[in-house]
Amino acid sequence: MPVVSVRLRARLSAHRGPGQLVVLGFAAAVVVGTVLLSLPVSAAPGQTPSFMAALFTATSAVCVTGLVVVDTSTAWSGFGQGVVLALIQVGGFGIMTLASLLGVLLSRRLGLRTRLTAAASTRSVGLGDVRQVLVGVGAITAVVEITTATVLTARFMTVYDEPFGRALWHGAFHSVSAFNNAGFALYPDNLVRFASDPWVCVPLTLAVLVGGIGFPVLLELRRSRWRPRRWSLHTRLTLLLTAVLLPAGFLLMVLGEWSNPATLGSMDTGGKLLNAFVHAVMPRTAGFNTVDVAGMNPGTWLGTDVLMFIGGGSAGTAGGIKLTTFAVLLFAIWSELRGDPDVTVFDRRISTTTQRQALAVALLGVAAVVAPAIVITSTSGFSGDQVLFEVVSAFATVGLSTGITADLQVWHQLLLVALMFLGRLGPITLGTALALRERRRLFRYPESAPVIG
């Protein structure tokens, strides 16, 4: 009987692709987290969070989103907050390692020639580098989180007079939340109380930025010793789009909120510039906020929607459709406008298959955002721009909110739960599925050209 059981499990595992294993793993983490948060010991004294609150919080933590329906600082006990922290770390670290290992598993399904070509052109991870991947991810995670936690702990103790234990806990929690791009905070106003403190805002923002760039880029920068000539196309595209979108987000905040008394208007010039920088980084991937998002102008909301949807680097803790996906689409459009037969970036030609994959991910992402936004807007009393902001934030696993999440109906919140799960795992599993399911035909149909535009 044991032999039959082992063989059965082996057959079942053999029929599961790497994408399916990732989905099952994260679903199991959500279930475990929901059960733990549903225990009485997880609730703060005098608080009785509902099962929906436990499910929503667990999903948001595992998917490193940051959207909540109850205040993390008051609804959960120390044990409950510890569960949230553990789910964030497992979700963030697991996403980084599993997304990278998917490339390793994927390479087994490709021929040797293809693997060698891919390794030479992208310096991607090979089958013999699994140990190096795990050690590299662990080292980067530990260094960034410990450094950020140390700075925050010292600041909380010396300036805000928090006892050592409380300061250490707050420093560690927010450090993990920042690097994993979760955006969970242990203060009712998130980080608004620290809006004028660069010693809190800057370390957290830098941790978010490092985590959102993506682990493959970080490892390659370390290996190449910051020599651009050795960078792969993936690294170049990620850094290029980061260098473009950060100033764009900064200008969005400066132009849209400089005189808004509900956000930047009441601050001095230094405070305005600091918070514009913070909110240039956060919409890309994390849900921390140092100003009241609900008080932003609708135009700023719309621009933030775009930044959230694009997201951050691949194989990291960021959400969205990813920087490289957006970059491939931009260069494809530019090549078409110029009349170039090929899409060429940094003296490298982007294959038609990659272009199709990028288009599929982007269009499916648009569909995943538009459909729920229409449904929730039609069945709730909130405006379309508010609902769109929440939906994009959930899909892109950002966590910024206009403050309506807790007031939505339960089935609306369940839609957001599904969006968070889809947004976190969708780009990874979809990309893998598209690569694994490429079919080869022994014949080709005649070519035709319908009228476009």
Predicted feature locations:
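Membrane-proximal intracellular helices of multi-pass ion channels
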Residues: 1-453
